């Protein structure tokens, strides 16, 4: 992903493309709700007009709308809870290495 971001123009490289775990949960739930409602509405529109194309266009339009909402990492939706990483621990010698150093002396 970093390689793809490096190919973008300089102003776009400054934009963050990461979302947190809570943001992923919100994005997934939003995606499910919108597409489920769109499927029901698309079915009803297609049934009422007896046109399968109207049902398909309704669902495709809702899919495009969902992509517009979900794909950008909006800071007010998907980046409210930043991840705090632990600092890396110092490497410690294992018990086997300590025994080997004692034997060589």
UniProtKB/Swiss-Prot annotation:
A Pfam family matched by this chain, by name? SPC12
Q: Is Chaperone among the key words of this record?
A: no
Membrane-topology descriptor: Multi-pass membrane protein
Protein source organism: Caenorhabditis elegans
Q: Topological domains (Cytoplasmic): residue ranges? A: 1-32, 78-105
Q: How does it assemble?
A: Component of the signal peptidase complex (SPC) composed of a catalytic subunit sec-11 and three accessory subunits spcs-1, spcs-2 and spcs-3. The complex induces a local thinning of the ER membrane which is used to measure the length of the signal peptide (SP) h-region of protein substrates. This ensures the selectivity of the complex towards h-regions shorter than 18-20 amino acids.
Q: Which UniProt keywords apply?
A: Endoplasmic reticulum, Membrane, Transmembrane, Transmembrane helix
The protein's job, in short, is: Component of the signal peptidase complex (SPC) which catalyzes the cleavage of N-terminal signal sequences from nascent proteins as they are translocated into the lumen of the endoplasmic reticulum. Dispensable for SPC enzymatic activity.
Name of the protein in its database record:
Signal peptidase complex subunit 1
| InterPro entries in the record | Spc1/SPCS1 (IPR009542)
- What domain of life does the UniProt record list for this protein's source? Eukaryota
Q: State a GO cellular component annotated for this protein.
A: endoplasmic reticulum
Q: Where are the transmembrane segments?
A: 33-53, 57-77
Which GO biological process categories is it annotated with?
IRE1-mediated unfolded protein response; protein targeting to ER; signal peptide processing
Tell me its family.
Belongs to the SPCS1 family.
Compartment(s): Endoplasmic reticulum membrane
Q: Which gene encodes it?
A: spcs-1
Instruction: Give the Lumenal membrane side ranges.
Output: 54-56
- Report if keyword Ribonucleoprotein is assigned: no
């Amino acid at each position: 992903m970093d390689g793809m971001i490096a190919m973008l123009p300089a102003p776009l490289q400054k934009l963050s493309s990461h979302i947190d775990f809570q943001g992923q949960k919100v994005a997934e739930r939003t995606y499910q709700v919108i597409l489920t409602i769109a499927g029901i509405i698309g079915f009803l529109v297609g049934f009422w007009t007896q046109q399968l194309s109207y049902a398909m266009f309704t669902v495709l339009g809702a899919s495009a709308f969902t992509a517009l909402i979900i794909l950008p990492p909006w800071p007010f939706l998907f980046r409210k809870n930043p991840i705090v990483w632990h600092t890396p621990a110092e490497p410690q010698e294992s018990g086997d290495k300590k025994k080997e150093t004692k034997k060589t002396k």
